[in-house]
Amino acid sequence: MTSTVKTPLPAVDDLAPQWYVIDAADQRLGRLAAEIARILRGKNKAIYTPHMDTGDFVIVINAEKVTVTGKKRSQKLYRRHSGRPGGMKIETFDQLQARIPERIIEHAVKGMLPKNSLGRKLFTKLKVYAGPEHPHQAQKPQPLTINTIPGA
């Protein structure tokens, strides 16, 4: 017995991506990254299709003010390797936040996206800025408030 149920695919008109701006000031890193990944993936929409890019663009401002709980500020490590022998570099959350605060949110969100070509395409829709300014005013981004602090 064969099934005749077709997978509903969203129309091209429905795929018009929105632009959202999220303020990361005083937000928890992991909860914020999970919500950003959900929006990039398009899981907040009724037309979500796993193998298609149905997500929206996300602009994150004030990345330098993102917070973590517990001792992660001094104990969470970020590793990178140059590819050369002895080229491993290790930084703590504090050190990386002082040097490149955007990289922290990018690293967290990238780990929550698919590890394939679709995930790489979705990652290009994330724009992270350390301060409160961004160059995407022409896209008319809508402010999106995310509460990542439980009980607040």
From Swiss-Prot:
GO BP, one annotated term: negative regulation of translation
Record carries keyword Ribosomal protein: yes
Name the record gives this protein: Large ribosomal subunit protein uL13
PROSITE patterns: RIBOSOMAL_L13
Segments of skewed composition (Polar residues): 139-152
GO molecular function: mRNA binding; structural constituent of ribosome
Organism: Thermosynechococcus vestitus (strain NIES-2133 / IAM M-273 / BP-1)
Sequence segments annotated as region (Disordered): 133-152
PANTHER family: LARGE RIBOSOMAL SUBUNIT PROTEIN UL13M (PTHR11545:SF2), RIBOSOMAL PROTEIN L13 (PTHR11545)
Domain of life according to the entry: Bacteria
Single GO cellular component term: cytosolic large ribosomal subunit
Function of the protein: This protein is one of the early assembly proteins of the 50S ribosomal subunit, although it is not seen to bind rRNA by itself. It is important during the early stages of 50S assembly.
Similarity comment: Belongs to the universal ribosomal protein uL13 family.
UniProt keyword annotations, A-Z: Ribonucleoprotein, Ribosomal protein
InterPro entries: Ribosomal_uL13, Ribosomal_uL13_bac-type, Ribosomal_uL13_CS, Ribosomal_uL13_sf
Subunit structure: Part of the 50S ribosomal subunit.
